[in-house]
């Protein structure tokens, strides 16, 4: 299986990499939170642009991205606008969503973009090609904050992302029971062993799914999300605790 290298970070080998989400509402908070995050122990900085009040103003968005880039130049920067339909803060039209991601790609400030699988097949394929032409990696994602589908459906979605040339397919699902967590882990293992030719990220959310955020190295998930301050999704634990557990499991 091939790995994905962003800056000096190799994703897809060793312990799962830790991603943290910055969810500031304005430029001033972007700056103050970036300074606070700089002291934390993580690998990838995700900027959740759907929390940014002025997200429709591309100049303002890129000014904030520049602050993040300058504050943490060594950290890979993942640009994410999570749509309302997948659990994000803001609704956005497909056209505006694609335009915003293209502007991020054009800026030269971001290393990776998050692209939602169900944006529309043609738009997704075109945006992936555009990102790759500009040396930007694509995390292709799908989120369900209500349920966990069958393992076959989870695998089908991850394989579709792979067929669309995502650098890293990602899926996050809400368990209704402990058996749903097992379904997610089973699907992750099967995908990793039988189909994946690149790193994947999977997680089962909420308190019930916490084990999935810790056991990625065992089942085949290459990264996990931790919280520096406020969690960006239910079930996230602090980066310090997360690093401790991931290191213990890696060294066992």
Swiss-Prot record:
Secretion signal span: none
Kindly identify the residues recorded as the active site: 143, 170
Quote the subunit structure annotation. Answer: Homodimer.
Q: What does this protein do?
A: Involved in the third step of the chorismate pathway, which leads to the biosynthesis of aromatic amino acids. Catalyzes the cis-dehydration of 3-dehydroquinate (DHQ) and introduces the first double bond of the aromatic ring to yield 3-dehydroshikimate.
The catalysed reaction is: 3-dehydroquinate = 3-dehydroshikimate + H2O
Q: InterPro entries recorded for this chain?
A: 3-dehydroquinate_DH_AS, Aldolase_TIM, DHquinase_I, Type-I_3-dehydroquinase
What is the E.C. number?
Answer: 4.2.1.10
Name recorded for this polypeptide: 3-dehydroquinate dehydratase
- Source species: Escherichia coli O8 (strain IAI1)
Gene3D superfamilies recorded for this chain? Answer: Aldolase class I
**Enzyme's top EC category:** lyase
Q: Which UniProt keywords apply?
A: Amino-acid biosynthesis, Aromatic amino acid biosynthesis, Lyase, Schiff base
User: Annotated pathway, please?
Assistant: Metabolic intermediate biosynthesis; chorismate biosynthesis; chorismate from D-erythrose 4-phosphate and phosphoenolpyruvate: step 3/7
Q: Which Pfam families match?
A: DHquinase_I
GO MF terms listed in the record are: 3-dehydroquinate dehydratase activity
Single Gene Ontology BP term?
aromatic amino acid family biosynthetic process
Q: Which HAMAP family match?
A: AroD
- List positions binding 3-dehydroquinate: 21, 46-48, 82, 213, 232, 236
Has the keyword Magnesium been applied to this entry? no
Q: Which family does it belong to?
A: Belongs to the type-I 3-dehydroquinase family.
Ribosomal protein in keyword set:
no
